[in-house]
Amino acid sequence: MKVLVIGGGGREHAICVTLAKSPKVDKIWCAPGNGGIAQVAECVDIKATDIDGVVAFAKGNKPDLVMVAPDDPLALGMVDALEAAGIRAFGPRKNAAVIEGSKSFAKDLMHKYGIPTAGYAVFEDSVSAIAYIKEQGAPIVVKADGLALGKGVTVAMTEEDAIAAVKDAIDGGAFGGAGARVVIEEYLTGPEVSVLAFVDGKHLKTMPSAQDHKRAYDHDEGPNTGGMGAFSPSRFYTEDIAAQCMETIFKPTVAAMAAEGRPFKGVLYFGLMLTPKGPKVIEYNARFGDPETQAVLSRLDSDLYDIFNAVIDEKLEEIDIKWKDDAACCVVMASGGYPKAYEKGKVITGLDDVTDSFVFHAGTSLKDGQIVTSGGRVLGVTATAPTLDEAIQKAYADVHKIHFDKAHFRTDIGIKKG
């Protein structure tokens, strides 16, 4: 079988590597791919958001399945366009991907269906938003409504920081159209947990829990990023909490989307906060998280191609998905300066010296036979082991073997206590 994967980051590398393990899959294309993905798939020079280009390629090359991984093409309706052309596609349609594409839609959905989340208000003008901030006080959370590469959230510890975030988003255009509307939320406390689930429109099967590290620097300091590392499972996500989330959050969300005429098919990511008052939803993503996917898929013990087909055919209930007991840790190596300005084209050395981890490539490309940096998040060094502590040690031992100019990584992935 032939599969086309859309995207070019560490998440897509993990998806391609996992699909390549399937005895049913004998050909993988990835558009646009990257320097690491090129080792397991044929990279195609088509942008992930080029719907017409992807559809034309699929019509010409006839993949048995197209897997749309990133948020932007999902929000633009790539799955709808592929299905309209008679091509099997994995991922939510445009009207379901809105659960990530608009935070105000997601908040209103949760409010309507009684799904636990933080209190909130939505604003399109800064004057009203600032008045609300002054009324509520700090700490408070300001979120751009639309897609902002994971960087549209400000956890403001002072009113001044919150007001600055509102002005940047609405008046300053910091996130373009994505920030023209903002959601202002109550500040929640507790451990954060990511739970991804396969969803076929009616049923869902959750993956093992994970925990992301969004801040750029150690001790959760610095600006938000797309994610500096992840580990699985979460230390805090017990069987009791999992059962509670299934009844109060996971099933109600899938049912709510179906009731709204927006059945969700694909991977639904639940960003949760385990508060003193119980689990609450911080955010939804309409796709595999990055870098959680690198950690979680390293633990998969079933055929990913079969799972994708079960989702598309709405037969998720008929398959059994197995996971390894091992823990996993993914440490992201980023370009110096990320998530702000950074340089590209730095030669990466030491990849052949890695012994105990798998290195997922994110912002890399091939240049004159060498792997060079081409993005903010460059590599995801991922190790599995019987215990989380062992996985962390293995991952960091290999991180220290890899070098590129101004490389930056957090030293506390997996050590986080809350």
Regions found by a protein language model. Name each.
Residues 4-5, 100-181, 211, 235, ...:
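Active-site nucleotide/adenylate-binding loops and adjacent lid/helix of ATP-dependent enzymes
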Residues 38-41, 55, 98-104, 217-218:
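Short, charged, surface-exposed secondary-structure boundary motifs
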Residues 156-293:
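Internal nucleotide-binding/catalytic subdomain
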Residues 20-21, 36-38, 60, 90, ...:
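Solvent-exposed alpha-helices and their adjacent loops that cap or buttress functional pockets
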Residues 310-418:
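Peripheral (often C-terminal) accessory segments that flank ATP-dependent C-N-forming ligase machineries
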Residues 1-94:
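ATP-binding N-terminal substructure of ATP-dependent carboxylate-amine bond-forming enzymes
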Residues 246-268, 285-354:
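Active-site "cap" helix and flanking loop/linker of ATP-utilizing ligase/carboxylase catalytic domains
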